[in-house]
Amino acid sequence: MDGAFPGCGVMIHHVSGDADPLFQTDKFAATQPDPARQLAEVKKKAGDLAQRRQALAPAIQLLKNAVCVPDKPCPVFDLPWQVEQSKSGKTSISGLSVMANMVETLRLGWSENLPLSQLAWDHITRASQITALLPLLTENYDLSNDVFYTAQKRGSILLNAMLEGVQEGATPNVRWLLLVAHDTNIAMVRTLMDFSWQLPGYSRGNIPPGSSLVLESWRDTHSGKRYLRVYFQAQSLDDLRRLQMPDSQHPMLRQEWRQSGCQTTDVGTLCPYQAALTALGKHIDRQSAPAVEMALP
């Protein structure tokens, strides 16, 4: 907050307990997926995992070259991809998930400006090398948080809060509401919104550090008509590494949501307000979206 509003002393509000209903939905009964159905939905979407793995062979080989010692065993890259479910009911793709974690670790190291010697032992020296690995993250999103049933059970409560936040009479009554979420939360919400993006230097649907999913409420002062602008934005890999402040020479990378009836304007893509709210909220599971109070103290 000090970065956005230096010297203003803006307070940060948070839940008093250990679990936040908007972001830690695995802690609450209303937002818990049924394990059997979740397993079935993941298997249905996954299809032929061997074929999926083969399609990503180039990215897998690049990752192996980066993190494995030449001529030494690196068994994780020999594992078949399989759908697995833990005792807690969480479903994942063994083999893929560990590769995705490796890629995320390398991407975070790059973004945090770690010395190149600490990035896969000097094997990662250019942003383009990170870009080439990111399809593995996209694949992991596709088969986890982007599975529609999972997103609907766990993301409905957050999307509902976001849409309520841009309505007239919303609580809290503020001009700018920032919800600090994980990439997993954004992934589930964008799935329900039918909103995907591909920013330059990133794979489809990638959610970089510091990125944001933005909803803006606009009103035409002449006609009184209301509009909604929705977009996803992030900085480039190189700008993140340099801690580059966004400016005219280093603009934010941005992709806007649109549907029929939206119009391109000087301030961005504006969509008729009620039609946009209806479209963005049509997949919300109301039973998984109990009311959340965000009144300021």
Regions found by a protein language model. Give the residues of each.
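Signature for phosphate-centric chemistry
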Residues: 1-177, 183-297
